[in-house]
């Protein structure tokens, strides 16, 4: 492809609304443009990258024995009502009506559609197991689209679904997908951490996320450098470590704390360490209110709480509801005398003479002990921190960092097959529910995550496996007929050898061409300049920034070998 003919509208300046590097660089490099909030158009270079990622995904899914299908993005309400998720999925689902007032949704995910098809088409154990997948557009009405394609309203996803006769079969399918994902992200050049995850609204027994460590990631992950344990913050278990506390209970004391509501304000006002406080948080779980107690320096893990209560919806109670329940304004809630269930984090068991809200505006109570109130249940209800030991090996404190989720796999069990009565007949003639797994990869997000991991001050550094082109030929002066002739000879020869190659034949300064080549991230640049008079040209590696000269007649062989060696680094 000639750059003079390529639709590549690069930008010198970074758009003001782009917050993170991947968003900035995808716009500056002419890879995409925004059509509306959270909706993007992919231009030729960007679309080539997405197609390459899709092809890697497709190859590894096929290699694992999965079969590709294509579902409709438009799904009827009745399908989602059958699973019970029409109301549960919430405002993120795009819902529409046709001219006859029939309701549909634009698919945010496709469990319902796949289960429906399999239920209708497979009835015998002889036809199982099956793993079906698609690479499809998904739609989610994000409240606040941000970070470019990291959180957008329309995106491409590979979603796969396995159907097995039993849990052992699911384990095999799950491992196949796990291994395929490892290969996919290796081939895409991504450094990923595989972490235990909560199953969330997807349901099911167990789950893993494939996370790309990044400061701009929306999720936090905890991992152990000693044993390799890794989990996202929602899932990471906090050890119940008994603490010997020989303090004698003291007499309770009500303290006037005017307009002092937060732990930070209380620490300053009372001169007491935050570990001596117990926070009382009032939540609404579906239609029920509960109180949750955690130590003053801890944060409630709402996922753990939601799972404990088996709640569909969980949110902090409104200020009005807090006042009705406690008799006090927000900031002064405490566990003493509450008429609702009180759940406490395990750490609270070992505290004595702590401070709580008095359920009286502008007052707290010092020297409170467990005997002063009733706890419905003690359990793990807090977020893990870097001061906590690894829950697996217990030998080292965990490390916590942010990450970008690029893949997620679930053991769904019978959540959807039961709802759809998706059964098979076994060898004894008995009908049994199929066991499901589901497996997703965000294609657009994978591209953005690659950029987040691989860029510098000059632009993107694409791994050769997903780069839009492998080589760019740059004749320094296209008005020099000799330079132009040699550049095009190399270009055409590389094309004949199956190399994906650009030639920058624009009548531009060499500096402009070099900057664009670096910006769009082409792995190798071949510069045809004045040195051709000596029979030489220059080859530059975008990733290492190393340059070297080669003889013109050896250039094709050298470039092909460089590409072969570079590709080998991403094979598994």
From Swiss-Prot:
Its EC number is 6.1.1.15. It is found in: Cytoplasm. GO terms for cellular component: cytosol. PANTHER family: MITOCHONDRIAL RIBOSOME PROTEIN L39/PROLYL-TRNA LIGASE FAMILY MEMBER, PROLINE--TRNA LIGASE. GO terms for biological process: prolyl-tRNA aminoacylation. Gene3D superfamilies: Anticodon-binding domain (3.40.50.800), Bira Bifunctional Protein, Domain 2 (3.30.930.10), YbaK/aminoacyl-tRNA synthetase-associated domain (3.90.960.10). Belongs to the class-II aminoacyl-tRNA synthetase family. ProS type 1 subfamily. It is an enzyme of class 6 (ligase). Catalyzes the attachment of proline to tRNA(Pro) in a two-step reaction: proline is first activated by ATP to form Pro-AMP and then transferred to the acceptor end of tRNA(Pro). As ProRS can inadvertently accommodate and process non-cognate amino acids such as alanine and cysteine, to avoid such errors it has two additional distinct editing activities against alanine. One activity is designated as 'pretransfer' editing and involves the tRNA(Pro)-independent hydrolysis of activated Ala-AMP. Keywords: Aminoacyl-tRNA synthetase, ATP-binding, Cytoplasm, Ligase, Nucleotide-binding, Protein biosynthesis. One of its GO terms (molecular function) is aminoacyl-tRNA deacylase activity. InterPro entries: aa-tRNA-synt_IIb (IPR002314), aa-tRNA-synth_II (IPR006195), aa-tRNA-synth_II/BPL/LPL (IPR045864), Anticodon-bd (IPR004154), Anticodon-bd_dom_sf (IPR036621), Pro-tRNA-ligase_IIa (IPR002316), Pro-tRNA-synth_IIa_bac-type (IPR004500), Pro-tRNA-Synthase_IIa_type1 (IPR023717). Homodimer. It catalyses: tRNA(Pro) + L-proline + ATP = L-prolyl-tRNA(Pro) + AMP + diphosphate. This is Proline--tRNA ligase. Consists of three domains: the N-terminal catalytic domain, the editing domain and the C-terminal anticodon-binding domain.
């Amino acid at each position: 492809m000639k750059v003079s003919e390529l639709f590549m509208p690069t930008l010198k300046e970074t758009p003001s609304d782009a917050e993170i590097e991947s968003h900035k660089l995808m716009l500056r490099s002419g890879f995409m443009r925004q059509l509306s909030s959270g909706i993007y158009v992919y231009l030729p270079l960007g679309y080539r990258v997405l197609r390459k990622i899709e092809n890697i995904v497709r190859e590894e899914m096929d290699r694992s024995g999965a079969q590709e299908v294509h579902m409709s993005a438009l799904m009827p309400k009745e399908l989602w009502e059958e699973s019970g998720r029409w109301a549960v999925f919430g405002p993120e689902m795009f819902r529409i009506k046709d001219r006859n007032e029939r309701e549909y949704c634009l698919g945010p995910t496709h469990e319902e559609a796949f289960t429906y098809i399999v239920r209708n088409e497979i009835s015998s154990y002889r036809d199982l197991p099956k793993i079906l997948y698609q690479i499809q557009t998904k739609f989610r009405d994000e409240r606040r689209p941000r970070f470019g394609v990291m959180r957008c309203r329309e995106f491409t996803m590979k979603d796969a679904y396995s159907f097995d006769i039993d849990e052992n079969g699911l384990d095999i399918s799950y491992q196949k997908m796990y291994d395929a994902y490892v290969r996919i992200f290796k081939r895409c050049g991504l450094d990923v951490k595989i972490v235990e995850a909560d199953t969330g609204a997807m349901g099911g027994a167990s789950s893993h996320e494939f996370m790309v460590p990044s400061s701009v990631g929306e999720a936090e992950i905890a991992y152990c450098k000693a044993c390799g344990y890794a989990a996202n913050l929602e899932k990471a278990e906090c050890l119940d470590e008994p603490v010997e506390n020989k303090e004698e209970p003291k007499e309770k004391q009500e303290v006037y704390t005017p307009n002092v509501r937060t732990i930070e304000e209380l620490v300053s006002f009372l001169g007491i360490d935050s570990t001596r406080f117990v926070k009382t948080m009032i939540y609404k779980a579906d239609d029920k209110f509960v109180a949750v107690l955690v130590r003053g320096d801890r944060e409630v893990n709402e996922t753990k709480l939601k799972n404990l209560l088996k709640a569909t919806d969980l949110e902090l109670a409104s200020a009005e509801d807090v006042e009705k329940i406690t008799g006090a304004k927000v900031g002064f809630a405490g566990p003493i005398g509450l008429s609702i269930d009180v759940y406490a984090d395990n750490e609270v068991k070992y505290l004595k003479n702590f401070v709580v809200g008095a359920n009286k505006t502008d007052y707290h109570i010092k020297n409170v002990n467990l005997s002063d109130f009733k706890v419905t249940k003690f359990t793990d209800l807090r977020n893990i921190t870097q001061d906590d030991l690894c829950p697996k090996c217990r030998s080292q404190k965990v490390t916590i960092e942010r990450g970008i989720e690029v893949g997620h796999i679930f053991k769904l069990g019978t959540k959807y097959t039961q709802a759809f009565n998706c059964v098979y007949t076994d060898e004894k003639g008995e009908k049994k529910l199929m066991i499901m797994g589901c497996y997703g990869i965000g294609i657009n997000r994978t591209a953005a995550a690659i950029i987040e991991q691989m860029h510098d001050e000059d632009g993107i550094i694409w791994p050769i496996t997903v780069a839009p082109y492998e080589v760019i030929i740059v004749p320094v002066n296209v008005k020099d007929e000799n330079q132009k002739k040699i550049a095009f000879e190399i270009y055409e020869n590389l094309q004949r050898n199956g190399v994906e190659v650009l030639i920058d034949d624009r009548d531009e300064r060499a500096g402009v061409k070099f900057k664009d080549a670096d910006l769009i991230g082409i792995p190798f640049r071949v510069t045809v300049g004045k040195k051709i008079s000596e029979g030489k040209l220059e080859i530059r590696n975008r990733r290492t920034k190393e340059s070297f000269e080669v003889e013109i007649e050896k250039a094709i062989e050298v470039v092909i070998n460089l590409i072969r060696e570079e590709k080998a680094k991403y094979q598994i």
